[in-house]
Structures are given as C-alpha cells and as structure tokens.
C-alpha cells in the first residue's frame, strides 16, 4: 500500500473535512475499478487498504512470489482501467482510438493511451489534442528519464502525428448512427442484474464482463416486431397534437482546471426546461454555459436532448414463455445510449387496468364472484373516501361482466373490499409487482391508486399471466449468455414459473375483457379478424392513458403521458389506436390466423336475467325493451348464486297505451314488463325509442 500517499490524503481530508484526495496503488486502483463503489469516504478507503493487503498476500501465496503477484496486478489494471467513452482496458482503447491491437501500437500511440489515465475526459486524444499531446510528452519524458527508451526513440515518438490516423471519430460517427435500441439496453440491464445476483459480481465487474468480456448473448427480441413498435412511436401522426411544447434535457460536464485531484475535478449537471422551438433550446444551452463556464472551468462533454413533451412506452411479450419480443421506452428517435426508459424505469399510476388484477381476479379465483354475479352500483364511502364512476352515474344492480366492460369504479372498489386488502395485495405480489408495498393495502388500489406506481413492463407481464392461463413468467430479455470460451454463463431457457390464477379464473377474466373490446371502453383497440381481450385505464385529470391487452398469441401494454404528469389534451384514444396498429401489423406480418382463447375444463353456463344478473323470474323473458334471459359462465364448483336469488328488477306495470305513462282511471291500458333501477329509471330504455315502441315513463301517471 502507498503509505505516504494515504498519509497525504488523510492530512488533506482532515484539513478540508472531506474525503476527495486519492492515494491508490495499482492494487487499490484495480479494486476500485472492479469491486468497490465510487463513493468517496474514509470507510471506503479503509476497505481498499484491507482488500489490497489481502489480495496481494493471496496472490503471492498462489503465484509463488511478490514479483509474480505484482505482474498479475499490473495485467488486471491494464485490462480494467477506464479510458473514456466507456472503454475498459488498453486493448479496447487501442481498438477504439487507433483501430489496432494493443500489441501493434507505436510508442507514440501507446504513450497517448497511457496518458489518458490521469483524467480520461480531458486527455483522451479525440477530446483535447493539446492536452493529450502534453500528457503524451510527460509519459515519454518519464520513460526517457528511467532509461526505458532511447533519445532516438523519444525523438521519433515525439515527432509522430498520432492524430492524423485516429479512427475513433469515424467509429463514434458510426456508433451515433447505430445507437443501441431500446431492447438491447433493457437486455443489458437484465444481464447485469443477473450477473450480480447469480454470479455474485459487483456492478463494476458485471459491466466489465458485458462490455469487455467477449460474451455471446442470445436475446429474445423479434427484430420485425421491434421495428414495427419503434416505427409507430416515431410517427407523429399517431399522436395528438398536444400543446406544441418540447422537453429539453442538457447534460454538461465541467472540469475545474485549478483542482489537480483527478477524482474530484469534474462536476456533472443536468439542466431541464420546456421550449417551443429549437432556437429556444439553443438559447437555453448558451445560458447554461454562460453560468457554468469561465477561465478556470472548461467544458469536457455536453449532450442536448430535445423531445416531444407527450411521451409513450410499449412492451410486447409472448405470454406462453415470458419472452419480451419488443420494447420502446419513449416517443420519437431514441436520443442516445443509456437514456431513461419509460417502459422499465418509469413508475406510473395504471388507472382502471388495475381493476382486473387487484379486485376481480382474486374475487373470482377465491369463489366469491362469477361474471354474472350482481353488485349494487351505488354511492359508498370507505375511510372518508367516496369513489365515483367516471360518468357520474349509479345504476343499481349490475353484473361483474358489465362492471368490467363499462369500467365502473364503485363495483371494482366494492369487490376489492369484499376480497380483503390482504388477499388482494398478495395476488398483486404473485403477479410479479416489485414496487408495491404495505401502504397499497387500501381501497384506492382497486382503481390503480398506488403509492409509487408500477412499470409498463410489470403491468404487461401481469396481463400476460392472465393470457397464459394464470401462470406467471418473469419478463425475459435474453435466453442464454455464453462466456468468451463458449461456456454457458447465464441460462434463462428454463425459467421458473408459478401459478397465480386457476385456469378457469384466467378464462373468465379473458372472456369478460373481450367485451371491453367489442362494446366497452376499448373498441379502438380492436384488431380486424382477431380475438382481443384487454382493459383500458385513465388516471385522474387524464394524466396517464394505458391499455393492456392480448390476443391468443401476444400480450402488449402501452402507456401515454407527460413526464411532468400534466393533463393530456385531446387524446382521442391515440394510445388505443397505436396499440391496435402495432399489433395488427405484427399479426399480419407473421400470418397469424384468428383462433379462440382456449377454454379449460371446469366451466358451465347458468341462466340469468340479462338485466339483473339474478336467477330469471317468470317475467324476465317478457321485458318490453328487450332484456331477456341469457346465460353466463360459472365454474362447476361455484356454490353461490350469481345474483343472490330470483330477479326482483323485472316487474309488471299497467300503462296508458297512448301516452306511455302509468294508466289513469280512464286510459286505454296495456301491461308491460320493465326492469327498473334503484333510482327509478328503466334499465335498457334506449335514448331514442324504436319505431313501434312507446316512450314509457313510470314516474308519471296519465291524467
């Protein structure tokens, strides 16, 4: 360990009450690069010292000598040292900057790479040629002083114009035109997490393995599906006009030239604003530079991103195996690498798309309700909170089926409370949600009112569970990863699964959510000639728009909204149209034929009154406006009644055959059977009475 250096750093830290002074030997630098986090603290420095001693002692014992241990440490250092642009190790740097192997570098080129290490963002040869040349000459002079090179070699290297044959600028241009797409970045993040969890690697080790380890990665991406999804997200015609504003994010790194310490002489800033033109964005950048830059604070790197304010994200999965086939984390062109992915990183409220998961799935799965079961739609209050239906109406006895396709809030909340918060919460955990907590054991969860929110990816996976007959697969971006020798490093091909719902429950939910598409709130998500089931969601003040749906082949979820969480103006079901467009194209491209959702054993049908959902009375088939007896699914082991008894909504009324009012003493009369809601309105009465029918009004009596 560099004892003198550590003592110098400690003295400086005590004097300044900070821990920014670095004093690392190669061993400690390797540990910093490979194992330890970047936090600057005394505890981390102590860890470095302890691990450095332990590592050197272990290597001396294993390799037989201190000299062999030092050579091994040097090799590790040269293979892991950061050399700007995300490069790790001298081989990667040689390839990037000069297009050759490290062993093929000239002395001048090698010295320029060696010089990068002090402050990579300043001394990289493609960043600042003047500073890079100065550093290169420092390295060459030190080598000459140590008699590692001759004067002639020094003179030749000093005269060589290494900048004339840099290849990195062309490489950078190619890379900027071929940024990692949304899928590749999501796959890298999952692989990194799995390396840390399953191989006990640190974050630094996992990153080095991915980018410098020569891995062969097999992803689950379907290229044509990814292209289709990205194309839709880039098509401005698919989106509402909005307010014409654009979000600006300006990232800037500033070098303090008066601070010689390489570990703390840079500051990084993220500045944001909203503009209506590129000129405004450029003016904003100029103002930030004027604020941050001066004679002693120089620009290292900066990056400007201008994006449409109204954003969207989409995920497409194969529900049969959990494979993610396509993912898009934002609208328009992807602004760069390692950018915010709204499909995996944004936690948003999901609105009514949470109703089937938090309320109806547990209720049906535990045998409390069936599609034809009746719940009274009426004003209710829970703990001071009174949920209201989106249309402001209450219609009395209503079936679960109608509650889903008409997206009725009161029915969902009543169902959630019937199930119990603890049970509902456990089902959500089983559906794979990782960002919910005990605070979500609340009635608001039935309507998607979560403490933190959930990601589009996890919500899509939950719907894929229903589409897959109730069996959950964790979303998977890769199938297998091989190391540089061809050995299996990570294997996702046989993923563990667990059952969340009975097959019968999954089918009943699917059958009810088909009605969302055929006659409910999701008609704009229909796919011509293909069965679709799904659920729409809208949060308060139209801040978030969501839809999660599936065919017998694929499950897809879409979110639309502003990062700033403001109201979406004139949305006009744009998210549903995008979903339908993307999924229609995918099924067409693959030549997929329509087929039914697979119906499991254990289901039968039961006759019910189509108005009340109860067991039909003798009057039900005589409804004046057409409500009659229908049937709906129940499980064969269902013990309860779908409506708690025989229909009480249908009653016979004597009316005036001329006015449609209740008959007076002298009126010509006729008897009609009507289903009457709890508020006295007639259920099923059309706004425009058909020809040949009376406009019946039972709230008035004919004179």
Outline where the language-model segments fall.
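Active-site-proximal alpha-helical segments within enzyme catalytic domains
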Residues: 1, 74-78, 109-118, 135-139, ...
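Short pre-catalytic segments that frame enzyme active sites
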Residues: 92-96, 121-125, 154, 160, ...
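Active-site-proximal helix/loop microenvironment
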Residues: 162, 169-176, 433-489, 494, ...
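Soluble, non-transmembrane domains of envelope/secretory-pathway proteins that act on or interact
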Residues: 256-263, 532-533, 537-703
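Peptidoglycan glycan-strand catalytic modules in the bacterial/periplasmic cell-wall system
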Residues: 1-151, 155, 204-206, 331-333, ...
């Amino acid at each position: 360990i560099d004892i003198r250096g550590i003592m110098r750093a400690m003295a400086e830290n005590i004097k300044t009450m900070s821990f920014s002074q670095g004093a690392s030997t190669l061993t400690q630098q390797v540990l910093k690069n490979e194992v330890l986090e970047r936090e600057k603290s005394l505890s981390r420095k102590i860890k470095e010292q302890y691990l450095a001693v332990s590592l050197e002692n272990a290597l001396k014992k294993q390799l037989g000598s201190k000299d062999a241990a030092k050579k091994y440490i040097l090799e590790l250092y040269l293979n892991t040292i950061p050399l700007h642009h995300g490069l790790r190790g001298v081989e990667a740097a040689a390839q990037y900057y000069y297009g050759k192997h490290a062993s093929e570098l000239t002395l001048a080129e090698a010295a320029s790479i060696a010089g990068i290490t002090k402050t990579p963002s300043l001394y990289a040869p493609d960043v600042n040629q003047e500073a890079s040349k100065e550093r290169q000459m420092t390295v060459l002079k030190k080598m000459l002083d140590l008699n590692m090179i001759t004067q002639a070699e020094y003179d030749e290297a000093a005269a060589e114009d290494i900048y004339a044959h840099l290849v990195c600028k062309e490489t950078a241009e190619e890379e900027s035109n071929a940024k990692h797409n949304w899928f590749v970045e999501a796959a890298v993040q999952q692989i990194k997490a799995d390396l840390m969890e399953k191989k006990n690697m640190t974050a630094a080790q996992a990153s080095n393995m991915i980018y410098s380890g020569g891995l062969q990665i097999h992803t689950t991406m379907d290229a044509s599906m990814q292209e289709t999804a990205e194309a839709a997200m880039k098509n401005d015609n698919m989106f509402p006009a909005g307010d014409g504003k654009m979000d600006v994010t300006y990232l800037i790194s500033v070098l303090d030239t008066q601070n010689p310490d390489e570990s703390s002489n840079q500051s990084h800033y993220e500045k944001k604003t909203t503009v209506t033109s590129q000129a405004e964005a450029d003016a904003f950048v100029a103002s930030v530079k004027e604020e941050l830059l001066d004679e002693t604070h120089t620009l290292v790197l900066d990056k400007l991103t201008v994006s449409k304010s109204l954003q969207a994200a989409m995920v497409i999965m194969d529900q049969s195996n959990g494979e993610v086939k396509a993912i898009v984390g934002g609208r328009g062109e992807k602004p760069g690498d390692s950018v915010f992915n709204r499909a995996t990183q944004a936690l948003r409220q999901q609105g009514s798309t949470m109703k089937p998961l938090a309320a109806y799935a547990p209720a049906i799965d535990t045998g409390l309700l069936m599609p034809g079961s009746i719940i009274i739609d009426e004003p209710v209050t829970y703990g001071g909170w009174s949920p209201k239906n989106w249309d402001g109406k209450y219609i009395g006895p209503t079936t679960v089926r109608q509650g889903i396709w008409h997206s009725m809030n009161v029915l969902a909340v009543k169902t959630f409370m019937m199930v119990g918060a603890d049970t509902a919460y456990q089902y959500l955990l089983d559906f794979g949600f990782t960002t919910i907590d005990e605070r979500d054991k609340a009635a608001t969860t039935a309507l998607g009112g979560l403490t933190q929110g959930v990601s589009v990816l996890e919500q899509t996976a939950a719907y894929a569970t229903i589409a897959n007959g109730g069996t959950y697969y964790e979303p998977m971006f890769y199938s297998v990863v091989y190391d540089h020798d061809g050995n299996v490093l990570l294997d996702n091909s046989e993923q563990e699964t667990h059952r969340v719902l009975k097959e019968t429950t999954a089918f009943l939910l699917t059958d009810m959510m088909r009605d969302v598409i055929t006659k409910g709130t999701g008609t704009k998500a229909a796919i011509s000639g293909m069965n679709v089931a799904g659920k729409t969601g809208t949060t308060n003040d139209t801040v978030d728009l969501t839809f999660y749906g599936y065919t017998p082949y694929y499950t897809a979820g879409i979110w639309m909204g502003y990062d700033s969480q403001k109201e979406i103006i004139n949305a006009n079901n744009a998210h549903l149209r995008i979903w339908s467009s993307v999924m229609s194209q995918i099924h067409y491209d693959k030549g997929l034929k329509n087929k039914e959702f697979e119906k499991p054993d254990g289901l039968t049908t039961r006759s019910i009154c189509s108005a009340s959902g109860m067991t039909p009375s003798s009057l039900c088939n005589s409804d004046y406006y057409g409500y009659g007896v229908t049937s709906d699914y129940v499980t064969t082991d269902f013990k309860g009644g779908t409506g708690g008894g025989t229909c009480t909504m249908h009653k016979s009324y004597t009316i005036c055959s001329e006015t449609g009012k209740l008959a007076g003493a002298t009126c010509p009369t006729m008897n009609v059977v009507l289903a009457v809601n709890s508020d006295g309105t007639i259920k099923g009465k059309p706004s425009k009475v058909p020809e040949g029918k009376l406009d019946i009004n039972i709230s008035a009596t004919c004179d």
